[in-house]
């Protein structure tokens, strides 16, 4: 069974993984994959009622900021 506690652990693992691949400047494809994994898991947690609207939005927009800030830095050298 998926409990809120187990879901939080899984979300944290995915968030840390996304942060790591972005911070360590892995390939753009790998960063995009990690971002997609994390944001997809956020949406699943929201759909299952584990996250409320506000918490989903907060985490999603933070992930979006991290990913797109890194992508902009990568493009601008």
Where are these regions (language model features)?
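Acidic, Ser/Pro/Thr-rich low-complexity regulatory regions
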Residues: 1-77
């Amino acid at each position: 069974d998926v409990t809120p506690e187990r879901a939080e652990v899984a979300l944290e693992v995915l968030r840390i993984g996304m942060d790591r691949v972005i911070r360590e400047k892995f390939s753009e494809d790998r960063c995009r994959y990690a971002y997609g994994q994390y944001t997809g898991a956020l949406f699943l947690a929201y759909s299952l009622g584990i996250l409320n609207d506000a918490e989903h939005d907060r985490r999603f927009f933070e992930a979006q900021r991290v990913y797109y800030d890194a992508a902009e830095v990568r493009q601008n050298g």
